[in-house]
């Protein structure tokens, strides 16, 4: 019987929240275990709060974790005996994954279960019943194959996520190989965790694999994982990305690391509309609405979306999904998947799907749709594990708190709630701190990133640095990125266009002056800009500058949740301490960082 063990770091509560002591010697070990089946909710200085939810447990089950393994881990780290209801809840949630299966039998698509009582419950459910074509027995239902995604989505809402074993179409064949030497002359091979991720996803080509999400830190080579999955599939592939810069990055990597030719790779963006056996498209083009310019508002990250998926008839470029016999759809940065693309994804469940992301966190609450329509989490690795192995850089995170001038404080106090964040985030006193930090890193490659263009324009003027915003032409962006990579410029000021798929491997300092409210995904993406391993074990530095005692500081705490879950710790600096602050240069354990820089290891 489990007894009181005060030396352990966890307290598991009956509401399925879990408290983790930060100062406990076993903190890091317990944190990495919890991350496999629980989500971090709060991270004050001494005690972090996690939540065990049905979705977090279903993702764990899909990755192969059993209820007994989860309970064993909790008991191993818990101070007190586990509440009995928590044991029951965990066993129940895990048992629900796969109790309903989706299979193909004699040319018909079936929902099946070995539990007649559950089948009866489903048959009478108001959401499930309209999707049934006919009931075949006391345990089997026939559904329309076109409703495959919608049925899975409904089953997640009901609480019985289906294990999809109905298989996939093979798609138009496309034969190519991975290079052993890149076009630039560097040796190329998959890293061990990249190979593991692909094998878990592919599942030997069986119906048990072929759909799902691979979660890896920025800079750990998610693009390479996608390319390796394409090599397994050997079929026509549609790749969806956040922006045109990412499209070009995918094209460069495919040409550099595979035997695919330029004639086999097409760009489908605002500038080109080439459909080839491998086509790379942006989410923004897909969600273009003739009466709603750009439709970029459809991207994830705003206010929570309606549970109803949107009508696709007014999105002309959605026809791309049916323009070729795709065998694989790759969703780069899947946490940004816009609602209209969810809708089309629900209708193409017969095609293999691979999501790539650094975080499954969505600010719109649609993680369940990623689970049901793209697939469950198939592979995840703690960021700090890859850091210890030297595959990503060691990063020191700093939160720099600045005061607000007295007259500004009064304006802030009387501002509306909507205006308060903008007012605090654009605090003029941040500008001097940016200049000081940039001076302390005069020999480094520094990115300054923020949300508000006037603020960024002033920073660019003070630092005499180029500014890239959404209005910057793609050609100009690529020219500046190329100059930064070549070491011709060492400062770049970026708007939120710098959040995603910007390949700047030598950047080792990032200064964040403002962001999208409390967005955890944005914080993770921005840190990812400096995660490529550095020469000689050099440290990377991530600074977030916030206005103290305002909404800016509150949102910063929310933004940091995901990175805290991954083991990052923010050191607090006050503005008066910055002049005397000296950034550390070398990682404590630079063991393998140096050997992992260059060639194949710089791949995105």
Q: How should these model regions be labeled?
A:
Residues 327-328, 333-398, 563:
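Post-DEXD/H (motif II) to motif III coupling segment of the RecA-like Helicase ATP-binding lobe
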């Amino acid at each position: 019987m489990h007894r009181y063990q005060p030396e352990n770091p966890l307290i598991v509560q009956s509401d399925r929240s879990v408290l983790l002591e930060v100062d406990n010697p076993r903190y890091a070990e317990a944190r990495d275990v919890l991350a496999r089946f629980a989500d971090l909710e709060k991270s004050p200085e001494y005690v972090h709060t996690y939540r065990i939810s049905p979705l977090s447990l279903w993702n764990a089950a899909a990755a192969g974790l059993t209820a007994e393994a989860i309970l064993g881990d909790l008991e191993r780290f818990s101070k007190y005996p586990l509440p009995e209801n928590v044991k029951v809840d965990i066993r129940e949630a895990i048992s629900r994954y796969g109790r309903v299966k989706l299979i193909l039998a004699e040319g018909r698509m079936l929902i099946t279960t070995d539990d007649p009582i559950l089948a009866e419950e489903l048959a009478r459910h108001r959401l499930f019943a309209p999707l049934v074509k006919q009931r075949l027995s006391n345990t089997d239902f026939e559904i329309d194959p076109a409703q495959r995604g919608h049925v899975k989505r409904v089953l997640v809402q009901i609480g019985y996520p289906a294990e999809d074993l109905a298989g996939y179409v093979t798609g138009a064949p496309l034969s190519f190989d991975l290079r052993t030497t890149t076009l630039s002359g560097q040796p190329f091979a998959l890293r061990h965790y990249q190979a593991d991720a692909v094998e878990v996803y592919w599942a030997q080509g069986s119906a048990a694999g072929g759909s799902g999400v691979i979660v890896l830190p920025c800079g750990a080579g998610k693009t390479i994982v996608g390319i390796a999955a394409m090599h397994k599939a050997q079929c026509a592939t549609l790749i969806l990305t956040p922006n045109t810069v990412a499209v070009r990055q995918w094209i460069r990597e495919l040409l550099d690391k595979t035997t695919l030719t330029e004639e086999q790779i097409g760009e489908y963006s605002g500038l080109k509309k080439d459909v080839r056996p491998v086509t790379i498209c942006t989410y923004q083009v897909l969600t273009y609405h003739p009466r709603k310019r750009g439709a970029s508002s459809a991207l994830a990250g705003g206010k929570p979306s309606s549970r109803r998926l949107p009508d696709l008839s007014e999105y002309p470029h959605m026809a791309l999904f049916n323009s070729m016999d795709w065998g694989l759809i790759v969703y780069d940065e899947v946490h940004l998947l816009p609602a209209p693309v969810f809708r089309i994804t629900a209708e193409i469940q017969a095609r293999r799907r691979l999501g790539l992301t650094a975080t499954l966190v969505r600010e719109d609450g649609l993680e369940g749709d990623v689970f049901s329509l793209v697939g469950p989490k198939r592979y995840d690795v703690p960021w700090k594990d890859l850091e210890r192995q030297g595959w990503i850089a060691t990063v020191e995170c700093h939160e720099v708190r600045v005061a607000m001038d007295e007259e500004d404080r009064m304006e802030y106090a009387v501002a509306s709630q909507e205006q308060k964040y903008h007012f605090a985030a654009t605090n003029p006193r941040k500008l001097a701190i940016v200049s000081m930090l940039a001076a302390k890193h005069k020999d480094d490659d520094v990115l300054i990133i923020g949300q508000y263009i006037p603020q960024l324009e002033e920073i660019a003027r003070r630092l005499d640095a180029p500014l890239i915003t959404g209005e910057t032409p793609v050609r100009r962006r690529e020219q500046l990125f190329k100059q930064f990579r070549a070491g011709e410029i060492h400062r770049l000021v970026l708007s939120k266009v710098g959040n995603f798929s910007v390949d700047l491997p030598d950047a080792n300092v990032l200064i964040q002056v403002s962001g999208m409210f409390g967005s955890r995904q944005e914080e993770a993406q921005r840190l990812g800009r400096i995660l490529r391993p550095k020469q000689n074990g050099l440290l990377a530095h991530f600074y977030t500058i916030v206005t103290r005692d305002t909404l800016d500081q509150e949102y910063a705490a929310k933004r940091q949740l995901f990175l805290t879950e991954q083991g990052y710790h923010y050191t607090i600096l006050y503005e008066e301490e910055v002049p005397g602050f000296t950034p550390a240069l070398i990682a404590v354990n630079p063991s393998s960082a140096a050997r992992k820089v260059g060639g194949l290891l710089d791949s995105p």
